[in-house]
């Protein structure tokens, strides 16, 4: 195994040297291999996978043509949400937790898996508390809706010689008093106001919780990419490729969760790119702590189980209950198959790229 690995490295080095000699300008030939540059580039490439779902998920206009005024009602989006649940569960039980337990088993002084279990429960509990707090604010806003159109009463009074209520002026009718069919005018104005309120409806806290969990997850990806490039260029390329393949289906599921939470397509894409900044931060931390690898691993060992707890909350508490309300048998089967496919895809990624 070692002989094959060294032969591979020598072969790659020879090809690299030939390409440099034949095609690269003299200015670039003086550059040496700098792991921190490739670490940041790898993290950026992985972060750009956040815009990939824009290609797959249809636009709001296309959904409207299909009869879905709310993107959350789209059958395709519900299938993607099922895929997201499967991907999250597969990521938790086939990648995050096994890696966390492996780290716990290396410490003979601690009870195996106890620390990881506590961090998983902490992640679930903290995400639950945050969602309860912000859901309470949202419920309070829903219980105090905006007043309905009152111009009808005022305008009718005006037309029939009545008096406007004290403090009201003719401007409150917006000039609608001179139009014969006052009721329809006011009704249209009320509908416009309601439509505007729907557009400005605050995004659900589940979307922000998902972004928080993804930021923490991307931080660990940055650590892994930078750590691999510090070992060798070949290890770094393989790690970047493996994480990228792992992230693309993950990003599609995350994108669907953000759409369900009230984000527009472009808002969701921008938010996904912002979470990629955590990957750059993770890469910088790994580079800065490259001389104290064991100490850094000890300090960041809680991140994976905590993220697993957050993913479990999002998948089983936030997304899955809505999917269970599906009444059409055909759609339920499609959603179940998408969930299983999400788990299977994460299993394949784990078998191919985890060591």
Swiss-Prot record:
The gene is Zip99C. GO terms for cellular component: basolateral plasma membrane; endoplasmic reticulum; Golgi apparatus; Golgi membrane. InterPro entries: ZIP. The chain crosses the membrane at residues 37-57, 79-99, 118-138, 273-293, 301-321. One of its GO terms (molecular function) is iron ion binding. Signal peptide: none annotated. Belongs to the ZIP transporter (TC 2.A.5) family. KE4/Catsup subfamily. It comes from Drosophila melanogaster. The keyword Zinc applies. Keywords: Cell membrane, Glycoprotein, Golgi apparatus, Ion transport, Membrane, Transmembrane, Transmembrane helix, Transport, Zinc, Zinc transport. Involved in zinc transport and homeostasis. It comes from the Eukaryota. It is a multi-pass membrane protein. Its main location: membrane. This is Zinc transporter ZIP13 homolog.
């Amino acid at each position: 195994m070692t002989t094959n690995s060294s032969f591979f490295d020598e072969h790659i080095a020879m090809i690299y040297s030939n390409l440099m000699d034949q095609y690269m300008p003299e200015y670039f030939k003086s550059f040496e291999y700098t792991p921190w540059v490739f670490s940041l580039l790898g993290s950026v490439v992985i972060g750009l996978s956040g815009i990939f779902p824009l290609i797959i998920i249809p636009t709001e206009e296309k959904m409207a043509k299909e009869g879905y005024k709310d993107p959350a009602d789209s059958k395709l989006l519900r299938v993607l949400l099922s895929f997201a649940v499967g991907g999250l569960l597969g990521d938790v039980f086939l990648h995050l937790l096994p890696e966390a337990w492996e780290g716990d088993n290396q410490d003979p002084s601690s009870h195996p898996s106890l620390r990881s279990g506590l961090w998983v429960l902490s992640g679930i509990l903290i995400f639950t508390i945050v969602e309860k707090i912000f859901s309470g604010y949202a419920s309070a806003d829903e219980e105090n809706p905006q007043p309905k159109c009152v111009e009808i009463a005022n305008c009718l009074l005006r037309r029939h010689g009545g008096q406007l209520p004290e403090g009201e002026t003719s401007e409150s009718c917006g000039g609608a008093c001179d139009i014969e069919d006052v009721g329809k005018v006011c009704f249209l104005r009320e509908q416009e106001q309601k439509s505007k309120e729907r557009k400005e409806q605050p995004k659900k806290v589940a979307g922000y919780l998902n972004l928080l969990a993804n930021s923490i997850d991307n931080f660990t990806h940055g650590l892994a990419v930078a750590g691999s490039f510090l070992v060798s260029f070949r290890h770094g390329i393989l790690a970047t490729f493996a994480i990228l393949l792992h992230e693309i289906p993950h990003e599609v599921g995350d994108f669907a969760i953000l759409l369900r939470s009230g984000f527009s397509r472009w808002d969701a894409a921008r938010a996904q790119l912002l979470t990629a900044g955590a990957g750059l931060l993770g890469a910088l931390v790994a580079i800065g702590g490259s001389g104290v690898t064991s100490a850094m691993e000890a300090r960041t060992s809680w991140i994976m189980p905590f993220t697993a707890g957050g993913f479990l909350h999002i998948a089983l508490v936030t997304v899955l209950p809505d999917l269970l309300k599906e009444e059409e048998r055909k759609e339920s089967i499609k959603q179940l198959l998408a969930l299983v496919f999400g788990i299977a895809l994460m299993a394949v990624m784990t078998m191919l790229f985890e060591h």
